[in-house]
Amino acid sequence: DAKMKDLLNSLAFGTNLSSVLIVVATFLVLWLLKLDNWMWISCSVVVGLIVGIVIGRSTEYYTSQSYRPTQKLSESGKTGPATVIISGIGLGMLSTAIPVIAVVVGIIASYLFAAGFDFSNVGLGLYGIGIAAVGMLSTLGITLATDAYGPIADNAGGNAEMSGLGEEVRKR
C-alpha cells in the first residue's frame, strides 16, 4: 500500500538519478573527445541542468497542494470569487520570478564557463548557452514520463470503477 508521498519520492529519485547520470556522462564524453576546454563546457551543461531543476522545483512549489502558495490561494476563496481571481493572478505573476531569474543567471554563467571567463570569446560563449539548453532539457524524457503517470493511473482507476470491480481494485 503505497502512499502518494512515497510515489512522489520515487519519481523525484528517478529524476535526480538521471541528473547525476547526465553529469557523469557529460564529463566523461567531453573528456574522451579531448577538447581543450572540456571542463568548462561540461560546467555549462551542469549549469543548464541546475536551471532545469530549479524551474521544476519552483513549479512544484507554486502548484502543489502541499505548499503554502496554493493553500493560501484556496483559503482566499472563503471571502469570495473576486479574491480568488486577484490572488490567483498575483500568485501566477509571482511564480514566474524564480524561473526567470534562474534562466538569466544560467545564461550568464554558461556563457562565462564556456568562454573561459573571457568576454572576447563570443563564439564559445554562445555555444555554452546552447549546450546549457541541452543540459536543461536533458531530463525532459523522465520528467514527461513521470508527468504522464498521473492521468494513466487515473484512467485505469476510472475503468475499474465503471466495470463494477470492487473498491480494492481502485486502491491498488
Regions found by a protein language model. Give the residues of each.
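Hydrophobic packing and interface segments
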Residues: 1-172
